[in-house]
């Protein structure tokens, strides 16, 4: 077996990174966008970024969101994952220094955990809605049948 000198190895890219990229863009793109915007607000409000730089990053994020066609975007190996795809777009538009500043004071683990919590919240909310519907139906049925005899 020949050694592969660059990242990612084609097998790893095909079997791990490409499916992860597809999943991230399909299920988590909106969460990535919300996290980026919330983090940008924090960076500006704490003075880590000045208003002008924060504004330029916000405009670039708006442009990226408006221009990206997630259905057409495929994993190419140019970047490791969806996180780096957005970062690469910011750097392309704003330069490497300003484009990289959005990631000041956070880690990919922070982002991953936040995304998973956001996705879990959606599922919990849906389950709670179903439980409320079931509880209402059971209460309605109990009230409708309150004079019915139940034979044991």
Question: Which residue stretches match the model-derived regions?
Answer:
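A helix-coil-helix interface module used to build multimeric assemblies
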Residues: 1-152
């Amino acid at each position: 077996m020949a050694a592969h000198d660059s990242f990612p190895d084609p097998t790893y890219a095909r079997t791990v990174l490409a499916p992860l990229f597809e999943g991230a863009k399909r299920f988590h793109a909106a969460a990535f966008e919300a996290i980026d915007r919330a983090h940008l607000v924090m960076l500006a409000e704490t003075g880590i970024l000045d208003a002008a730089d924060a504004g330029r990053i916000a405009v670039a994020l708006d442009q990226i969101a408006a221009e990206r066609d997630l259905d057409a975007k495929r994993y190419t190996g140019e970047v490791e994952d969806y996180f780096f795809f957005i970062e690469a777009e910011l750097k392309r538009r704003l330069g490497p220094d300003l484009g990289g500043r959005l990631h000041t004071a956070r880690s990919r683990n922070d982002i991953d955990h936040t995304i998973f919590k956001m996705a879990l919240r959606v599922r919990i909310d849906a389950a709670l809605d179903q439980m409320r519907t079931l509880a209402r139906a059971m209460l309605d049925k109990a009230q409708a049948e309150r004079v019915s005899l139940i034979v044991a």
